[in-house]
Amino acid sequence: MHKAGFVNIVGNPNVGKSTLMNALVGERISIATFKAQTTRHRIMGIYNTDDMQIVFSDTPGVLKPQYKLQESMLNFSTSALTDADVLLYVTDVVETPDKHNEFVEKVAHMEIPVLLLINKIDLSNQEKLVELVEAWKALLPNAEIIPISATTKFNVDYVMKRVKELLPDSPPYFDKDQWTDKPARFFVNEIIREKILLYYDKEIPYSVEVVVEQFKEDAKKIHINAVIYVERDSQKGIIIGKQGKALKKVATEARRDLERFFGKTIFLETFVKVDKDWRSSDKELRNFGYQLD
């Protein structure tokens, strides 16, 4: 008998959802940084064996939207509650259980199995952990609570074991050689954006969108032209930096990661353009692939 199903990872920003996703799938599918709101899209990572297929989905952190981009991010998160066979609700030892009560209330009424994962336990102590477990039991009495550390991979194997046990019998949903639902260009976008998140401060990383305008691949190399969009001229200057040094650093670091990701020589050219207030434009958000409905 073959098992298959959709396992969706949800939770607040910066609790370690993307790190967990990568640990479960065994591939670096989602970018992960120390900054909140790193993930903007719903990203599938597909784990295959001969008799099983697990379709994991990493989702943006739950937040109160302040502009249309964040509305789209919240849509990705809430839609993950409607099509899961198993839900992984990720919290951590820092945030309080009463954060985003409305979303937790939706999770509490779900009829599918819910694994509540308390992440980053390597940063806490036993007494604090016991308090959190009791608080979450009161909020989500039907959930199975598992303390984990996605970074050190503590209990990640146990989470995978429980997921496998909870999956329904089903034929596979995707070809067995497929490991994600995203095209190659998407990962180029994400890797470049990850470097911007790491190397720039304040609002700059959140005002950026990356678009691959050219992706030409042959047996040994890939030529990539990527445009970094910002909202204002002042942001363009900051991204480029003095004598272009800041942008060069981003491109150099991104190229190294892309070569590891694709296993080929990468020729990467980056450009910076202004798209005024794109985060609040329905048209531009749709052009960039965001879900608005």
Which role fits each region the language model picked out?
Residues D51, N75-A143, K216-D218:
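Conserved C-terminal guanine-recognition region of P-loop GTPase G domains, centered on the G4
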Residues M1-L81:
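Conserved G1/Walker A P-loop phosphate-binding module
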